[in-house]
């Protein structure tokens, strides 16, 4: 049975890029599978197939045809089918399930995944942690992404971290940037602790 990790967050927060980075960091040690969700295309899956050194059959794109969080929370049948297909064919250690870009209320059904990560980015605004969406409050790990952009959008990362800590209570969170690859080690450590 695979460890299934959901990854949700608003459009453009860096979900696909996170999966790309994590796959590159984990693929030599673990067997991986990826399921992506888009409303009318398989754009994210196609991107990952082009950029990753991973068998294309290990990446499945789901076209939800509607509201992104419905496919990961309410009617999970298309995603479950994709996960089962990966498990039967490859028996992966880890399957990443990426939701389509959504608002702050995205949550996963725990019938689909074991744990989920919620991704926000600093360019979305300093007030995002204070808006207390379900993804931000209840995800198993919150990632504040694109910290390298903070100076350009006039975000004080210290203040943002205070807001995140206050709203997350005792739940884990990390601040990362693809431009600072060592920050991704925190996410890798979190995942490896679950295996």
From Swiss-Prot:
Subcellular localization(s) per the UniProt record: Cytoplasm
HAMAP family named in the record: UreG (MF_01389)
Keyword Cytoplasm assigned: yes
Family in the record: Belongs to the SIMIBI class G3E GTPase family. UreG subfamily.
Name this protein carries in UniProt: Urease accessory protein UreG
Purpose of the protein: Facilitates the functional incorporation of the urease nickel metallocenter. This process requires GTP hydrolysis, probably effectuated by UreG.
InterPro entries hit by this protein: CobW/HypB/UreG_nucleotide-bd, P-loop_NTPase, UreG
Residues the record lists as binding GTP: 9-16
Highest taxon, organism lineage: Bacteria
Oligomeric and partner information: Homodimer. UreD, UreF and UreG form a complex that acts as a GTP-hydrolysis-dependent molecular chaperone, activating the urease apoprotein by helping to assemble the nickel containing metallocenter of UreC. The UreE protein probably delivers the nickel.
Gene3D superfamilies: P-loop containing nucleotide triphosphate hydrolases
Keyword terms, alphabetized: Chaperone, Cytoplasm, GTP-binding, Nickel insertion, Nucleotide-binding
